[in-house]
Amino acid sequence: MASKSNDFYFNAFVEQSEFSIQIVEKVKNIFENYNTINLRTSMDEVHLLEHTADIKHHEIMEKLSKEFIPPIEREDIVVLTQLLDDLTDYLEDIPILLYTYHVKTIDQAMMQFMDVIDQSVHQVTKLLSVFGDFKKDLTIHKYIIDINRLEENGDILFHEFMYKVFEEEHDARYLIGQKEMFTKFEGILDTAEDIANEVGNIIMKNS
């Protein structure tokens, strides 16, 4: 676990997750200072971050294609780096959906869901920051549990918010937009949970 080649993958996973933090912070800023006039510019800024994250993903895959003996199973590296890439992709979708569905305001439900997403993305980075030392670090399982708990919280919020929206609103376009937004939010938390579970599976196989 000490060679530079081994360190590359674990460090790269952290770098991928840090792009998700940058995007989620940008999206939070969009929510907190919501202005439809500036939305296209914000979308471009988020896309630039996502594109840079894509480059890191391709860098990992290129190195793996030339690697003789990777530190963990090749298939596990592929799955984990793809999940991390998916996370940045799904986060990028948030401002795109705001634009596509002409969302006029950010309500409390969206802010509350975004807070859970923010926590989950930060926990993913904390998890991956200790992943390279998984045989010694005792905090790793705490992060996995935390991410799973946040996903469960997201499920509860999703069902509560969707029930409320369909009970109170009757405009079809608004309902479609809200459903797409909340489904995307839930998908982001599901992906974070998939990352945590994949890390847990890798640890089990290598312990």
Language model: regions and residue ranges:
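Cytosolic, long alpha-helical scaffolding segments
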Residues: 1-207
